[in-house]
């Protein structure tokens, strides 16, 4: 029989993937000890940072259709990464059974697993998370550069969020990875830029919840 914890995790990941409009204010219980604690700290910090940034943006841009119900949801990682699929628990990712072996392992350079040794599937998961973070980091930097040119200076990105993304990327340590996307080069329209910011923040918060749940799972495994 499949471990109940694995089934709960995959149910959550699939739900987050297909229902982006859900409210995600609560997190799954986490374990504070064991391997992966460092990256769990970073993922929790990232989730707090993006949640705070989104809340501030919704308050500042209340006339820009910045609520979850008003925006057009967009996933910039679609067809470019496969984090939900890559982060399936190994028990559910092999031959559709719960008898998968954990013997296959790789040596990783990151700090998300205390031993530095992890399964092939876990490495794929962490690499996909890194690519997600890198894509969003590039997009947020491009948007922030435009916002800083706005004479009104109505809103700008919280540097704490950008720092939180960078910290988790550094901990994952897949520096050689390339991402299949460059920041979009649109005309300098500050209204569209602010709407785009709202769209990205909502999407990234959902992804941050997924990442936090996955780090919690790895930490307690």
Swiss-Prot record:
The keyword Zinc does not apply. InterPro entries: 4_helix_cytokine-like_core, IL-12, IL-12_alpha. SUPFAM superfamilies: 4-helical cytokines (SSF47266). Residues 1-25 form the signal peptide. Glycans are attached at residue 95. It is found in: Secreted. Keywords: Cytokine, Disulfide bond, Glycoprotein, Growth factor, Secreted, Signal. The keyword Signal applies. Disulfide bonds join 39-112, 66-198, 87-125. GO terms for biological process: immune response. It holds the Pfam family IL12. One of its GO terms (cellular component) is extracellular space. Its main location: secreted. GO terms for molecular function: cytokine activity; growth factor activity; interleukin-12 receptor binding. Belongs to the IL-6 superfamily. Heterodimer with IL12B; disulfide-linked. This heterodimer is known as interleukin IL-12. Heterodimer with EBI3/IL27B; not disulfide-linked. This heterodimer is known as interleukin IL-35. Interacts with NBR1; this interaction promotes IL-12 secretion. Heterodimerizes with IL12B to form the IL-12 cytokine or with EBI3/IL27B to form the IL-35 cytokine. IL-12 is primarily produced by professional antigen-presenting cells (APCs) such as B-cells and dendritic cells (DCs) as well as macrophages and granulocytes and regulates T-cell and natural killer-cell responses, induces the production of interferon-gamma (IFN-gamma), favors the differentiation of T-helper 1 (Th1) cells and is an important link between innate resistance and adaptive immunity. This is Interleukin-12 subunit alpha.
